[in-house]
Design a protein with these regions (language model features):
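Sec-type signal peptide cleavage vicinity
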Residues: 1-188
Length: 188
């Protein structure tokens, strides 16, 4: 997490609590669902009574590992962070899951603005993650969500399987290029 000894960080009496939902995937290997997600990385920005801006840094939590043992157990993390005592003070959140899969590089405490992620697909299918992300939950207060930060995760990747059939039974053929166009809206 971020530096826990920073003097301007809130030390309230009510701990931050987390919840997660995951949108339904259409086609993924080792699909991440709300019940199968057991860990996530959380970024939190404490901004006092100011709204989140692009110049803010993750000074409250930075890639904090938040985990649970099963879908019925609570989310836990250490050290525990608390909601500010001042009801006007705000904390903004981002999250991704699962926490730190192979091939994922995430930004640190020195980067301003939203966290950035770079993911390299692993060669072995067993090492590939179904990465889910939650966009910003800006300017949260204890009163705005009754103390529970609820992330709505979305699948960041798409799995594409290509099957080629040689109907002529010809030999010596090689596929040298395969191209997919940009399908931003999911339609052709």
């Amino acid at each position: 997490g971020a530096d826990d000894n920073t003097p301007d960080m809130p030390q309230g009496d009510i701990p931050l609590d987390f919840g997660v939902s995951v949108d339904q995937a259409v086609s993924r290997a080792a699909e991440t669902t709300a019940s199968s997600l057991s860990s996530m990385g959380v970024y939190a920005y404490y901004t006092g009574n100011n709204n989140l801006s692009t110049s803010d840094k993750p000074n409250f939590m930075c890639n904090q590992k938040v985990e649970r043992t099963n879908s019925a157990s609570p989310w836990t993390y250490s050290p525990v962070k608390y909601w500010p005592n001042n009801p006007a003070d705000k904390v903004s959140f981002y999250a991704y899951g699962p926490y730190a899969p192979k091939g994922l590089n995430v930004s640190g405490t020195t980067q301003s603005g939203p966290p950035t992620m770079e993911y390299t697909i692993q060669g072995a299918e067993a090492d590939q993650a179904d990465l889910v992300i939650a966009g910003a939950l800006p300017n949260q207060t204890y009163a705005s969500n009754n103390g529970k930060v609820s992330f709505k995760m979305f699948h960041a990747l798409t799995r594409v399987d290509i099957n080629v059939t040689n109907v002529d039974k010809a030999t010596g053929m090689t596929i040298t290029v395969f191209t997919m166009g940009s399908l931003l809206d999911g339609k052709r």
